[in-house]
Amino acid sequence: MKTLLLTLVVVTIVCLDLGDSLRCYMGPKTPRTCPPGENLCFTKTWCDPRCSLLGKLVKLGCAATCPIPKSYEDVTCCSTDNCNRFPKWERSRPRPRGLLSSIMDHP
């Protein structure tokens, strides 16, 4: 009887511990379980010299505290599973220009 009770206690502790693990996106479609002590998900975005052509750079991940943004960065943090989805950009991207598009533009 004591063995059964001890087994139930161990299983309960393990299950409760797993329930506290936060899941965050680490890439556009890759959620992972955060390490112990990291209870926040974050999304960090910033521009580089190619930002006008390719859009902002994005870093997703887990953190113990919300990262402090540098002057050129935007950072958001949240604390529920998979709450840091890859951003959907509202800005339209320029149309690629090449031989085929030039022919299509001038029939």
Swiss-Prot record:
<comment type="similarity">
    <text>Belongs to the three-finger toxin family. Long-chain subfamily. Type II alpha-neurotoxin sub-subfamily.</text>
</comment>
<dbReference type="GO" id="GO:0030550">
    <property type="term" value="F:acetylcholine receptor inhibitor activity"/>
</dbReference>
<feature type="disulfide bond">
    <location>
        <begin position="78"/>
        <end position="83"/>
    </location>
</feature>
<feature type="disulfide bond">
    <location>
        <begin position="34"/>
        <end position="62"/>
    </location>
</feature>
<keyword id="KW-0800">Toxin</keyword>
<dbReference type="GO" id="GO:0099106">
    <property type="term" value="F:ion channel regulator activity"/>
</dbReference>
<dbReference type="InterPro" id="IPR003571">
    <property type="entry name" value="Snake_3FTx"/>
</dbReference>
<dbReference type="GO" id="GO:0005576">
    <property type="term" value="C:extracellular region"/>
</dbReference>
<dbReference type="InterPro" id="IPR054131">
    <property type="entry name" value="Toxin_cobra-type"/>
</dbReference>
<protein>
    <recommendedName>
        <fullName>Alpha-elapitoxin-Al2a</fullName>
    </recommendedName>
</protein>
<keyword id="KW-0008">Acetylcholine receptor inhibiting toxin</keyword>
<feature type="disulfide bond">
    <location>
        <begin position="47"/>
        <end position="51"/>
    </location>
</feature>
<comment type="function">
    <text>Binds with high affinity to muscular (alpha-1/CHRNA1) and neuronal (alpha-7/CHRNA7) nicotinic acetylcholine receptor (nAChR) and inhibits acetylcholine from binding to the receptor, thereby impairing neuromuscular and neuronal transmission.</text>
</comment>
<dbReference type="InterPro" id="IPR018354">
    <property type="entry name" value="Snake_toxin_con_site"/>
</dbReference>
<keyword id="KW-0872">Ion channel impairing toxin</keyword>
<keyword id="KW-0964">Secreted</keyword>
<keyword id="KW-1015">Disulfide bond</keyword>
<keyword id="KW-0528">Neurotoxin</keyword>
<keyword id="KW-0629">Postsynaptic neurotoxin</keyword>
<feature type="disulfide bond">
    <location>
        <begin position="24"/>
        <end position="41"/>
    </location>
</feature>
<dbReference type="Pfam" id="PF21947">
    <property type="entry name" value="Toxin_cobra-type"/>
</dbReference>
<feature type="disulfide bond">
    <location>
        <begin position="66"/>
        <end position="77"/>
    </location>
</feature>
<dbReference type="InterPro" id="IPR045860">
    <property type="entry name" value="Snake_toxin-like_sf"/>
</dbReference>
<dbReference type="GO" id="GO:0090729">
    <property type="term" value="F:toxin activity"/>
</dbReference>
<feature type="signal peptide">
    <location>
        <begin position="1"/>
        <end position="21"/>
    </location>
</feature>
<keyword id="KW-0732">Signal</keyword>
